[in-house]
Structures are given as C-alpha cells and as structure tokens.
Amino acid sequence: MKAGKVWGTTELIEANGALEFHRIEMEAGGICSKHLHRYKWNGFYVESGKMLVRVWQRDYDLVDETIVGPGQYTKVKPGLYHQFECLESGVAYELYWAEFNHNDIVRESVGEMKTELISDFEIRLDSDDSYHLYLQEG
C-alpha cells in the first residue's frame, strides 16, 4: 500500500522483527522531515534520480551531506538527525534495521561435563605389556 508524502510516495515492501524495507518514489524539490531513529539504522539505495542525504553529527554545527545517485547507497547511524532532499525525481529504497550485540551473553555459571569420580582403582601392567584399569573392591 502506497502512502503519500509531501516529497512523493512510500510503499512498504517488508516489515518484520529484524528490518523494514520501503520503495520510495521521490519528486524533485521534495524534502523529508528532519528526524532521528533512536535504535535503527537508516539506509538509502537509489535506483533512479538523485538524492541528497544530510546528517547532523553530534556536534550540531557539523552537517554531512552525501549525494546518492543511481546504483549508490548510504546509511545513517542510529541517534543522528538526518533528512533527505530529492535533487532529481526517481525511485529509491529505504531500509531500516537494528543491530544486536554479538557479545551480549551474561553467564551465571560455567558449562561442565557430568562425570562420576572413581577414587578406588589400580593401574596394572599386564603380561601383554599393556596397561589396564582395575577397580578395587572394598
């Protein structure tokens, strides 16, 4: 289902617990709102047309601007204000995803192998020159 925006239209392709994927039709001169995502990355892949992506760095006076053309991709880290402007009408794809920490495990105990402890045994060298383990009866 397409949703109208001031700058064009967006169509949700997929949304699940790991990502969100949209096809956007952008109109020259259109500018999306300046916004941020607390936890999600935001990626832009341009199929046709041209897009300017602005990213306000944590030092609010520093603004990075990236022009993305056909076949090019850029991404914005979570927590940074950003905005796109359509320089030439076209089609782009917008992708949102969150990263998980590969080292997020907290261990309460250490793994182990259960074994029975044998305390009463004897090792003997037999007549065939091999060692054998004998349990002592007691």
Model features per residue range: what roles?
Residues 57-79:
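Short acidic-glycine-tyrosine-enriched beta hairpin
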Residues 33, 53-55, 94:
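Short hydrophobic/aromatic-rich beta-strand segments that constitute the beta-sheet cores
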Residues 39-58:
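Glycine- and acidic-residue-biased ligand/ion/polar-headgroup-sensing regions
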Residues 36-38, 45-46, 86-89:
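Short glycine/proline-enriched turns and hinge-like loops at secondary-structure junctions
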Residues 21-25, 43, 65, 73-75:
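Conserved hydrophobic/aromatic beta-strand scaffold that supports enzyme active sites
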Residues 1-34, 40:
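A short glycine-rich, His/Asp/Glu-containing loop-to-beta-strand
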Residues 31-33, 71-83, 100-101:
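Histidine-centered metal-chelating micro-motifs
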Residues 85-138:
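Double-stranded beta-helix
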